[in-house]
Regions:
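Acidic-and-aromatic substrate-binding clefts and catalytic sites of carbohydrate-active enzymes
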Residues: 64-68, 168-170, 198-204
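Membrane-embedded segments
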Residues: 34-35, 39-118
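Extracellular serine-dependent O-acyl
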Residues: 190-193, 208-234
């Protein structure tokens, strides 16, 4: 099977090479696009959709991806794909806390779509440059397969109900709205999601994403709540609660 070729690394890659393999897919062949940071490419395994439901998907994600990067990557992806549904992870809305952070991310995002090595300077050796610019087909459809299991040791009420709301920077919110409008203009249905994350998620962030989804007239699906009973944090995480392993993703 395709899974047999996976190595099951324990650490997040500096650069998720398989994301760029979306450009090796036949044009207009992807039904559902998932886009976000390392939580997305660790949690969403598109092959399961194909096996169980018969529709195609691809997961695009880079480590610590910011919302301006999401916007720039969407524009690039839409030159080749017209997905019916776009799942946008909301975790990257919380990374840039100030206007300066946002402006810095916007500049880097525009440059990175033209020169990927600007953002990933540690790849500056012949082998890694080949990974960035070479034509590589991803049998995992962007998913980053990891088999290791490290249980969560923390005991906390991470999803304890509250009406308090996490503050999202206005520039981040504005860029997110641009993502939504762009997806709609291309004929796609954008959906805001949050994937399972024990250590980094809480009800204040849930409330913030629900609020921004309502303002943009889209649905929000919080998998931290939807899959609360299905995820076993003693077995389903690769690193003790930040990212899912293959068992959790399935």
């Amino acid at each position: 099977s395709s899974l047999s070729i996976a190595m099951g690394y324990n650490a997040n890659p500096l650069y998720n090479y398989s994301s760029y393999s979306i450009f090796q897919e036949p044009d207009n062949s992807i039904d559902v696009l998932s886009i976000g940071d390392s939580n997305v490419y660790s949690s969403i395994f598109p092959l399961v959709w194909w096996e169980q439901q018969g529709f195609t998907g691809y997961t695009w994600g880079q480590p610590s991806q910011r919302i301006p990067e999401t916007y720039e990557y969407l524009k690039k992806i839409y030159k080749h794909q017209k997905p019916s549904i776009v799942l946008i992870d909301g975790n990257n809305l919380f990374r840039d806390k100030t206007d300066i952070d946002n402006l810095d991310s916007i500049t880097k995002a525009k440059l990175a779509t033209i020169f990927p090595v600007i953002s990933f300077h540690k790849n500056l050796n012949p082998h890694r440059l080949k990974n960035i610019f070479g034509n590589r087909y991803s049998v995992m459809k962007g998913y980053y397969y990891r088999k290791a299991s490290h249980k969560v040791h923390k005991k906390k009420h991470r999803m304890k109900f509250t009406r308090k709301c996490w503050q999202i920077n206005k520039l981040s919110a504005s860029t997110f709205s641009k993502c939504i409008h762009y997806c709609k203009s291309q004929g796609s249905i954008p959906v805001l999601i949050s994937v399972p994350n024990y250590n980094g998620w809480n009800y204040q962030k849930h409330n913030a994403l629900q609020e921004i989804a309502d303002k943009n007239g889209i649905n929000f699906v919080d998998l931290n709540l939807e899959l609360k009973k299905q995820i076993n944090w003693k077995k389903d995480s690769v690193d003790g609660g930040d990212h899912l392993n293959i068992k959790g993703a399935k």
